[in-house]
Amino acid sequence: MSFSADEAAHRAASDAEQIAWVDEQDNLLGAIGRAELRERGLIGRGTYILVFNSAGDLCVHRRTLSKAIYPGYWDVAAGGMVQADESYAESAARELEEELGVRDVALHAHERFFFDQPGNRLWCAVFSAVWDGPLTLQPQEVLEARFIPVAEVMRETEHKSYCPDSLAALKRYLASL
């Protein structure tokens, strides 16, 4: 897999980042490097921010090929791993600004759930926001982004690769409406 030196450096820094390590009940156990957490099959915390525009369309974005998990997949949520020293809400605000350039927007907290797949074991916190402003994409993590109707997103999941963890977050959000 080929990616830029900038993406490679970003990936190395991301793998070394100290993130929250938790147990099956979401109790904080300590801090651990992201790559080590994955390698050892431990559980972390993740945030999933569903960004809608005022027309109700959902922002989907394509992940870069340098991502450790689901490279090149489409994603229905901004978000990422919760750092060791931050809350779910702090992580959501940070990730939303980093990935899409969205800041100073009301984040609405929804449910938390446990996602368990080999190499991706997370307590997930779902948030939503409404944003009609411009998007500023983080080139080391996001290749492209667009707003599309939720029904179209669900159709696309039948023939395009979408991240299963963020899809689980979206489905739980939709079921709660």
Model-identified regions with their sequence ranges:
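Acidic, metal-coordinating catalytic segment for phosphate/diphosphate chemistry
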Residues: 3-48, 54
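Nudix hydrolase/Nudix homology domain
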Residues: 2-5, 33-35, 84, 109-114, ...
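Short glycine-enriched loop/turn motifs at secondary-structure junctions
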Residues: 13, 75-76, 137-141
